[in-house]
Amino acid sequence: MNIMPVSESLMADWLGLRKLLWPDHDEAHLQEMQRLLQQTQSLQLLAYSDTQQAIAMLEASIRYEYVNGTQTSPVAFLEGIYVLPDYRRSGIATHLVQQVEAWAKPFGCIEFASDAALDNRISHAMHQALGFHETERVVYFKKHIG
């Protein structure tokens, strides 16, 4: 396995995995990806198999605003992680997360946070396996006023 930061030349691989993680955001992907590549406080990683197949992706950022369940700022935040089903439970996610931890420390981060949908038990189990612990559950509301 080989892990590398995303670059322009790897956009197609990143896009393919990103669409598997967030299938409902098809049209917005490319614009957001271009924006993310320009930000110094975001990190995008791809993992490749020994046969050079893109098998996992991770997106992380440094957040300075309040992050639920944390006590400090800035905080490293796991924005998204996806490992192809055939490669899960093989340590790939652990290696990706370890790279984020090393990347975030020079920013002054001592906490690493993430979130998951309330009903996404697979994500909850993955987070726990990666060393995260649940801090709180939140339901967001909105109201149209216009």
From Swiss-Prot:
GO biological process: response to antibiotic
Gene Ontology MF terms in the entry: aminoglycoside 6'-N-acetyltransferase activity
InterPro entries in UniProt: Acyl_CoA_acyltransferase (IPR016181), Aminoglycoside_N6-AcTrfrase (IPR024170), GNAT_dom (IPR000182)
Enzyme's top EC category: transferase
EC number assigned by the record: 2.3.1.82
Reaction(s) catalysed (UniProt annotation): kanamycin B + acetyl-CoA = N(6')-acetylkanamycin B + CoA + H(+)
Stretches assigned to the N-acetyltransferase domain: 1-146
UniProt-listed Pfam families: Acetyltransf_1 (PF00583)
Binding sites annotated in the UniProt record for substrate: 22, 25, 66, 79, 115, 136
Keywords in alphabetical order: Acyltransferase, Antibiotic resistance, Transferase
Gene3D superfamilies listed in its UniProt record: 3.40.630.30
Residues annotated to bind acetyl-CoA: 81-83, 120
Alphabetized NCBIfam families for the sequence: AAC_6p_Acine (NF000224), AAC_6p_group_E (NF043067)
The protein's role, per its UniProt record: Catalyzes the transfer of an acetyl group from acetyl-CoA to the 6'-amino group of aminoglycoside molecules conferring resistance to antibiotics containing the purpurosamine ring including amikacin, kanamycin, tobramycin and netilmicin.
Subunit structure: Homodimer.
Protein name: Aminoglycoside N(6')-acetyltransferase type 1
